[in-house]
Swiss-Prot record:
InterPro entries: CmoA, Methyltransf_25, SAM-dependent_MTases_sf. Belongs to the class I-like SAM-binding methyltransferase superfamily. Cx-SAM synthase family. Pfam families: Methyltransf_25. One of its GO terms (biological process) is tRNA wobble uridine modification. Homodimer. This is Carboxy-S-adenosyl-L-methionine synthase. S-adenosyl-L-methionine binds at Y39, G64, C65, S66, D89, N90, D117, I118, N132, R199. Its EC number is 2.1.3.-. It comes from Enterobacter sp. (strain 638). Catalyzes the conversion of S-adenosyl-L-methionine (SAM) to carboxy-S-adenosyl-L-methionine (Cx-SAM).
Amino acid sequence: MTDRDTLFSAPIASLGDWTFDERVAEVFPDMIQRSVPGYSNIISMIGMLAERFVQPGTQVYDLGCSLGAATLSVRRNVHHQGCKIIAVDNSPAMVERCRRHLDAYKAPTPVDVIEGDIRTIEIKNASMVVLNFTLQFLEPDNRQLLLDKIYQGLNPGGALVLSEKFSFEDASVGELLFNMHHDFKRANGYSELEISQKRSMLENVMLTDSVEAHKARLHKAGFEHSELWFQCFNFGSLVALKGGQA
């Protein structure tokens, strides 16, 4: 049982920028389930993708791992010898709780949980990399550099899973899906005040891209194939493949 997210239920006099601090980490499972449509589906399908792409003796990277939901999904579905998962997050509160969550679910595949900057983590011998709602929090100038590094660190036949909140080039579509997302949050018990205050805190730190912009970056990084495999309203996930045989 996780704590319910009531962080923004009362007026906040001075809304700063969003941070993944202790208070957010404490309610994060409830927050993300009630805020991100399709999140549970994406997490479970990441495990299925891992079963298909992860190879013996290779590494899996979960970059921006938060509390380790994607890492747990991968670990449940990887049964090869010599594999290791490297989970990275720059939030001390998230890392601490992630380690506790992983310790509670024993499995043969080892996991290294690292408190650090995903932009400086070395990526090597990777059969799969996960960026699950992470890239949107990087400065735009750093996004291509990270994707370039991921491509270089992936083995031939490896896969990148990139989940994001999207913007849309068609303003009418963007408005519709934006409103549907807000209906989703209201249906999950968030008030107008909670929705408004959280949006104000996120607007300077979460900068979204269109699916087309993501695909262009992935192509520039060297990925031979990329496609949207899941979408619910303005949230979704792409898979990008490095050519060659695993």
